[in-house]
Amino acid sequence: MAAPRHASALARAARQPAADLRRRDRGAPDDAWIRERLRAAAVGTLATVRDGQPFLNANLFAYEEAVDGLGTIWLHTAHVGRTAANVALGAPAPVCFSVFEMGRMLPASRALEFSVEYAGVVAFGSGLVVEDAAAQRHGLALIMAKYAAHLQPETDYEPPTDADLARTSVFRVEIESWSGKTKAAPDDVPGAYRWPATGAPT
């Protein structure tokens, strides 16, 4: 099999730390920017791997800041499933987690030069299935507080019972490193548009 084009450059890229960016000019301005993206994102995608097979699961989540360290991501899924198996059988399982927001399309005179505004974060760390009931309730309470902030536990809904906890898997991702990447163009860029464009085929 012939070597791929740019083989030496690809080999160097493969040896870089996971959170390193090729385009440093588009890196997040600071860690506060990354934390804000993790707090505000509606959905995140968790990547796990088992026996060489990658697996992605998009899910609701909550990000919890830490006094020391980068913080924790909390998620939950069904009690038995691929995500639960990949994390439990590999614990502490190497995982990564991503959130992404798309902005405007930025047209150009050549197809190669088209671009897009974006803001995204990739976090790398260790995934664990949470077994302690108090910790499970803590993580689930953070998720409820994020997505149902206008409702009050005990008043508007019943918090998870022991029976409920037996039916779900709660996961904790301890973030070890992260990177953020963003591109934003001036408001007056000619022809910039939101996708899908009005009149575009559907």
Regions found by a protein language model. Give the residues of each.
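Short, structured beta-strand-loop surface elements
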Residues: 79-139
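Beta-strand secondary-structure signal
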Residues: 74, 96, 124, 172-174
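Short beta-strand segments
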Residues: 41-79, 97, 107-113
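Short helix-to-loop capping/linker segments positioned immediately adjacent to catalytic or ligand/cofactor-binding
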Residues: 45-50, 108-111, 127-132, 154-161
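Short gly/pro-enriched beta-turn/loop segments at secondary-structure junctions
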Residues: 41, 92, 116, 165-168
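C-terminal edge-of-domain segments
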Residues: 1-20, 131-202
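Short, basic/aromatic recognition patches
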Residues: 16-45
